[in-house]
């Protein structure tokens, strides 16, 4: 989502980035994913990771979520992206044949946003799931959903440390199975 917003704004589009949480960034920021495009070289994410590793403000070195959030928020604001944090998409507005806007709720009020284009960069396609487009969940080979990882963050010897712990496969749409992990 952050890279789609940044790229569109860089090309001159008026961009609104809706974020459900209080901070921007999904898997790349909050999930602290490093490396994209199956290891291909190049891309804005590489510039950002280098920028994070060169920081001298935060405890520890690396691409920590809170560092990414502050750097990316500044980058997007500087290029003119309108950041709306704390909003949940509640509906898609259609004309005869295409999506032309979104409705979103911030907990108190509903806003309506007209759009020439909508990019659904949510974790599980939350916006597309509001439409009547046929959907299919899980992998083609076995119907299983994606692996789930728990990211633990702590201080060790005065240094901020983050560890990914693979929790195995689970069905994130099953509340009982999800809550056991």
Identify the meaning behind each predicted range.
Residues 1, 22-24, 34-36, 90-91, ...:
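Solvent-exposed loop/turn segments at secondary-structure junctions
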Residues 27, 48, 101, 105, ...:
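Flavin (FAD/FMN)-binding glycine-rich loop and adjacent Rossmann-like elements that form
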Residues 21-46:
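Conserved N-terminal glycine-rich FAD pyrophosphate-binding loop of Rossmann-like flavoproteins
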Residues 1-16:
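N-terminal Rossmann-like FAD-binding beta1-loop-alpha1 element of flavoenzymes
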Residues 14-15, 23, 82, 134:
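Residue-level detector of anion-binding/catalytic polar loops
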Residues 56-130:
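Feature captures the FAD/FMN-dependent oxidoreductase FAD-binding
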């Amino acid at each position: 989502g952050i890279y789609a917003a940044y790229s569109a704004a860089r090309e001159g589009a008026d961009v609104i980035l809706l974020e459900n949480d209080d901070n921007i960034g999904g898997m790349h920021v909050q999930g602290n994913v490093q490396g994209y495009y199956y290891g291909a070289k190049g891309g804005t994410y590489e510039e950002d990771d280098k920028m994070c590793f060169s920081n001298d403000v935060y405890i520890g070195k690396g691409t920590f979520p809170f560092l990414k959030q502050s750097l990316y928020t500044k980058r997007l604001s500087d290029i003119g992206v309108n950041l709306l944090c704390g909003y949940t998409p509640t509906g898609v507005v259609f004309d005869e044949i295409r999506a032309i806007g979104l409705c979103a709720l911030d907990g108190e009020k509903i806003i309506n946003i007209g759009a020439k284009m909508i990019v659904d960069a949510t974790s599980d396609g939350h916006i597309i799931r509001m439409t009547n487009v046929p959907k299919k969940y899980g992998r083609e080979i076995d119907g299983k959903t994606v692996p789930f990882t728990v990211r633990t963050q702590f201080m060790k010897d005065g240094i901020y440390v983050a560890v990914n712990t693979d929790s195995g496969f689970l069905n994130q749409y099953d509340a009982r199975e999800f809550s056991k992990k």
